[in-house]
Amino acid sequence: LGADVASALNYKLGDDIVTFAEVLRRKGYATGYAGKWHLDGDGKPQWGPKRKFGWEDNRFMFNRGHWKMFADGPNGPRVGSTKNGRPDYGLKGADEKSFATDWLTDKVINFVNEKKGKSFCYMVSYPDPHGPNTVRAPYDTMYEDVKPPIPRSVNKTRAQTPKWAAKAPRITADTIRILMPKYYGMVKCLDDNIGRILDTLRKNGQIDNTIIVFTSDHGDLCGEHGRLNK
């Protein structure tokens, strides 16, 4: 997609769309969703959109944002960090219970345990790995001694850069050296948490009767053409 198109993707999914979750729900599956949805317009974070599209338990679904901390409150889930009274991407004080990747994984595990012995479909949409390149301890320093590769394209002139990347602010090799070890930490944290889900399925005797799909909406440029993210 061109940058002009990608910047306008806060669309609402049409009411007439039948998702695979709705098909499974009609067949008697227990369905649930936690994490980023990004299919209900501009709401941010907008917890538990009213239009569920088959995801019966969508309490922990939020529409937009790459939040780093979450918390459970008396009125439902909330972003765990605020600035000037508004949710922000901070992670001060984040731990294995409040950091977004861990918190969302706990919701998956709770659902899997509750539906043990039943047919279910649960989708978790982790914000990470994604900018801002920050992650909780100990992952924040786990790869600080790693020297990330510096793409040759980072030093090219704007005239040598593809049009979709040429207008955006550029990062330097020094920035890549600082931020990519954090990115590796985000990936490791995600890997460990997916391992927790698999361990739960094994413990419950569900691992051989569960289809597991691991996918992503985009990769990361990792400094190519002076860009991070997509």
Enumerate the predicted regions with their spans.
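Catalytic-site neighborhoods of secreted/periplasmic enzymes
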Residues: 1-97, 137, 228-229
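Active-site-proximal cap/lid insertion segments
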Residues: 63-230
